[in-house]
Amino acid sequence: MKRLMANHKQKKAILIALAAPLMFSPAPLMAVTGTSEPVVAIARQAQTIVSVQQINPTTVDVVFSNNQRMTFDFYGDNIFRMFQDNNGGILRDPEAKPEARILVDTPRRPVSKLDIQDDNGQVTITTGKVRLQLDKSTALLKVTNLTTNKIVFEETKPVVYEKGKTILTLKENPDEYFYGGGVQNGRFSHKGKAIAIENQNSWTDVGMASPTPFYWSTNGYGFMWYTFKQGKYDFGATEKNTVKLSHDTDYLDVFYMINDSQIGRAHV
């Protein structure tokens, strides 16, 4: 009995010693467990923005306190790409086997102007049609359509990077509805539901045969995750008033299209 108690205390001390670096280290770590499979710690977006710079006529880099950076690349006055690879990767096309493409040959349109302001605890990036606002203390993004002066979407949580998975969280409005995702058999409007972005080769009810990583919102924006990886879009099914978007990729690469017409939101 005494030997069992001694072994128990020894194991407890070892677990505490292993847990200490996880509790106090600021960097993303992998928790060590007694099993052969590691538990992956969640790596959230940096909490603060330290600088912003325009690197070419259409592209802006935002630098965070952990030296990671997010790139905003404008494909027109109302279309922008948001990219972040914490492993140091640069803007690129997603890999596909067999080889495939998502964008058309000439996806860019003229950007009439690109203005950057960094003051009052906020970074503001403005074109002739949209305004992007980033809170410097949280890095949360809010986007306004300057034609209607309406906030079309805003983040409610920082971007989350897990091993092999990236998650975006947006606010859902009570009168907002969502459509798209490709062929989602038996479903048309996705409010209050979750849809899988994966080819299940199923033509039955609730099956997926031709998914697309794109949806549009009646609030005035279209969204496309620039990837061929599987994903899941949750439009308030798990958490009310919350849109949770995720794909099985370790970097962020998405397009937003801001427009007050349905046709405009459906074009990249």
Describe the predicted segments one by one:
Residues 10-12, 23, 86:
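Compositionally biased, intrinsically disordered low-complexity segments enriched
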Residues 31-265:
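N-terminal accessory segment at the very beginning of proteins
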Residues 15-17, 43:
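Residues marking helix boundaries in flexible regions
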Residues 3-15:
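Bacterial N-terminal signal peptides that target proteins for export
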Residues 17-25:
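Bacterial N-terminal signal peptides
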